[in-house]
């Protein structure tokens, strides 16, 4: 078997093939002339080429296949000879006169095949003789190929049920005995290869054994194809005998391959009914055997079997498949003390997937698997093996993918304990997977207890207190994570206000301790969710039992104030400013004047102390004016105070055009059409006159700075405000004041040089003409204006 090099091996193969071809030619010539003696002579010489020890398994196989093809011709010739009167018994004896044992046994197997076909003797006797005689070849390579030839030519002549060779003297038991004996001897030869030659060639020998393994495995395939091998025979005879040989050979390569062969070639039904026998052998295998892969494939096959055949599911419970697999995995891990953490996690991951497929309604089984995994991981600390971490994520993702419902996963008490063994980065990944599952399946989390459990699972993306120093998180990834948390908040919902208030309190607890950089993402949706809760509160008097509500608007507004207070420190004062105004509007609808005033006060403080950018001030002031205009809860004193502050802010804006627009916007604060108490025409007119004054000042500044009269757009905007209030019937806005302003605009020298202002003015005049065409009071009022 030892080759000096690939070139020498090619030469030996070429020389052997040439001699083989020459003898095959003379053998064929003897066959053609019906010369049995010469046919035997040249066939023996031809087969002598298989006695070489210089070829690798791959090259030897080439030579073997040439011999196989020629032996098929010789077998046909033997059959014809028996028809011409040659005694098959004499032929069987004659082939044994060959000088060398290897050619003799090949010829004996060929003659034995003919002997069985003639049915002149029981098939079991001939098969037993052949399999015993083959023990004469103990060279591993030559012996394996010889027995492979025996298995090949005999597989269609086994006394199986329904076979023509079945009879009173020949039963399927004889066929099974023959195949098992041949398998046992072949496995011994195959294992012996591992221990021949120097230690430095171990890798080469293992490679060669890998090339030869199918020769051994074919015996198990033959067994699986026998009609007579039913469940009883498989359980009582085949499986115990095969496992006995596998365990006793004590060879890592053989044990791994043959166990896998059993799983792959025999029916799933047989595996299900013999689980205890098959699994009982696993702890007895060598510690180096990759039992993880073997058991994973077994569980995968059983899972697929259950998925394709729903009617077999009761049998899984009947044979206690889960318990047997779980116990077997525990024993294997216990037997292999040095088993890598990856292997253990993979085994439990496969078991969990098996459980979810076969027993989806048994959450206790799934939780038991997770508990076993926790027990195995205990004392290991954070897992630093990348592949093991990936497998752990796969294990944790399995319940989410199966149930499409995080609520179900939350019922698994050991689930969060497994999450604890993930490192910080992987916890973030797992948290994202959980949140995406919730959003994809529109899963509502309806109790504070479940929300608390959920946030324990996803704390990797809502809490940065335990992140290691120096851990840099990509900003885009961070924003994406926090946006997903913001979306998640809207999936935490309960129609009962009391339970919903408990939920938002849980959110508050986690968000306020989650680190300042996350607050600008999480506080706004929390505020919105809480404001929705306020709208669902029962109106006073709706409770017929007179029971005092534990959740009141006052409590909720206090809660809102507490969470918004955290934002200016982030810093996100503009965000806090907007939220205060939203809360003020909500308080207005609840008729809570003191609370609404307090929220406005907080907004004003932020405007004065935190918002310094001129553009931001303009936007903020527009929000103040718009919100204050819609407020109906304030009494005269509070409203005057807030309105006075707003007009003061407007007059202090940096840019004159901004001042002008803010001041004329304040005019809306003094005239609300639907509220007679807020209809102060004098102050409306005062705001508009002040706006005209500021617009005039802005034009002078433009003239001084740029040498031009500046845009007339501000005057046209003010004209539109005059028209609005004139149409609403404000007494102080007279026809004369409107006509005077129109005349002022027409006299502006800058109008022709500013197409946009010219177009704006033309559109305003067209609007006035359109209003004149209307019937009723509005048409009459506009008719009075002479353009």
Swiss-Prot record:
The keyword Acetylation applies. It is found in: Cytoplasm; Endosome membrane; Prevacuolar compartment membrane; Golgi apparatus, trans-Golgi network membrane. The keyword Kinase does not apply. GO terms for biological process: protein transport; retrograde transport, endosome to Golgi. It is a peripheral membrane protein. Keywords: Acetylation, Cytoplasm, Endosome, Golgi apparatus, Membrane, Protein transport, Transport. The gene is VPS35A. Plays a role in vesicular protein sorting. Component of the membrane-associated retromer complex which is essential in endosome-to-Golgi retrograde transport. Also involved in the efficient sorting of seed storage proteins. Binds alone to endosomal membranes and is required for recruitment of VPS26 and VPS29 to membrane. The VPS29-VPS26-VPS35 subcomplex may be involved in recycling of specific cargos from endosome to the plasma membrane. Its main location: cytoplasm. Belongs to the VPS35 family. One of its GO terms (cellular component) is endosome membrane. It comes from the Eukaryota. This is Vacuolar protein sorting-associated protein 35A. Component of the retromer complex which consists of VPS29 (MAG1), VPS26 (VPS26A or VPS26B), VPS35 (VPS35A or VPS35B or VPS35C), VPS5/17 (SNX1 or SNX2A or SNX2B). Component of a retromer subcomplex consisting of VPS29 (MAG1), VPS26 (VPS26A or VPS26B), VPS35 (VPS35A or VPS35B or VPS35C). Interacts with RABG3F. The modification N-acetylmethionine is found at residue 1.
